[in-house]
């Protein structure tokens, strides 16, 4: 009951934040558009007005500047980081749900089909947000135990709101 309510409430919040901003998913991007926007941010300090969802570009540009690496390298590393976050989130969430020794491995195997989706090897904003969902669900699962998890859940909701076009 409570888990379903949390999922429905989170989805309601995500949808309502975008409706409150006055737009839904407007444009379709490919990976090279995201890389180009990140290059625009690095070279000129801003992104063009046509980039309605700049989260991926901003993250790539700022991370590349922080670690002094190229945008191309960041565009190669970000999908790997998101896949790692996905697998780690699935493992943590599975262990939080059940202590049965076969539950975590079976949940990991059950989560593998999403890795064959067409958008997975890209750096699109949808990929980043979808890959963070298991970690978000784990944080929601743990919200009743500590206020730290509630703060993390709030941060993740803001992250999803800014990063995923609905």
For each of these PLM feature ranges, what is it?
Residues 20-26, 73, 116-126:
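Membrane-interface helix caps and helix-loop-helix hairpins in membrane proteins
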